[in-house]
Amino acid sequence: MDLWFSEVHTPDVKLSLRTAKQLYAGKSEWQDIEVLDTPAFGKILILNGHVLFSDADDFVYNEMTVHVPMAVHPNPKKVLVIGGGDGGVAQVLTLYPELEQIDIVEPDEMLVEVCREYFPDFAAGLDDPRVTIYYQNGLRFLRNCEDDYDIIINDATDPFGHTEGLFTKEFYGNSYRALKEDGIMIYQHGSPFFDEDESACRSMHRKVNQAFPISRVYQAHIPTSPAGYWLFGFASKKYHPVKDFDKEGWKKRQLFTEYYTANLHVGAFMLPKYVEDILEEEEGKK
């Protein structure tokens, strides 16, 4: 008998994956956690019924989350990751020797342990000596930060449940305060294709645009995300993601990537017309 996992995107749309085996199922204080083995995407991590990432496509998310701000900020030393318990973002950050401190704020200790067991390649990033994990609420952690970080990455992907506070006006304001005078914040902007997701994208962009002088959005193709399309937010106190992009400097690093390139960096900010329209409408609101 075939076993299938289905993630509901809308009442009329599902993402369905043939499943070879359920590797893990448990419930932490914060969420339901499941790991499935699939023929098409390898192991997938599911939180509260939603695919967080898969072996096959997580490199896209991690590379676009990290390399974009690292290729723009001229001298980053300290990075804060809100969420990130799987270690994927940390693993890419550790490729940069100039980083002196990488702080991970993840409330769910069980999630970290599950990822260490079933996704050891990603979780290896958590073992770098520059990485410190704080098992705390991200919003509460930020309230005690001021002028501390060069880059903040909000690695929470959905504005629901225990991560809802990471998509509020307070969170973006606290992130602004926690950044140094030339700091950059990267956040997950979601997928704008379906109506409910579009509403969340609008809300995020409006709040960030009010909190930061520079607010831009870039894109990537991630097959397991809704509609296979994902947006990232780039918010900055000083640097523009394209005008201040150090293309030649990044290329000289000769880092191995599977998705991100210097040319793609610029192209990722060239958005479809319907997405531009959504963002421009929200930028006009106060």
Swiss-Prot record:
It is found in: Cytoplasm. Spermidine binds at D86. Catalyzes the irreversible transfer of a propylamine group from the amino donor S-adenosylmethioninamine (decarboxy-AdoMet) to putrescine (1,4-diaminobutane) to yield spermidine. S-methyl-5'-thioadenosine binds at Q31, E106, N137, G138. This is Polyamine aminopropyltransferase. The keyword Magnesium does not apply. Homodimer or homotetramer. GO terms for molecular function: spermidine synthase activity. It holds the Pfam family Spermine_synt_N. The lineage of its organism: Bacteria, Bacillati, Bacillota, Bacilli, Lactobacillales. GO terms for biological process: spermidine biosynthetic process. The keyword Phosphoprotein does not apply. Its EC number is 2.5.1.16. Gene3D superfamilies: Spermidine synthase, tetramerisation domain, Vaccinia Virus protein VP39. PROSITE patterns: PABS_2 (PS51006). Pathway: Amine and polyamine biosynthesis; spermidine biosynthesis; spermidine from putrescine: step 1/1. Belongs to the spermidine/spermine synthase family. The active site is at D155. It is an enzyme of class 2 (transferase). GO terms for cellular component: cytosol. It catalyses: S-adenosyl 3-(methylsulfanyl)propylamine + putrescine = S-methyl-5'-thioadenosine + spermidine + H(+). Keywords: Cytoplasm, Polyamine biosynthesis, Spermidine biosynthesis, Transferase. It comes from Streptococcus pneumoniae serotype 4 (strain ATCC BAA-334 / TIGR4). Residues 2-237 form the PABS domain.
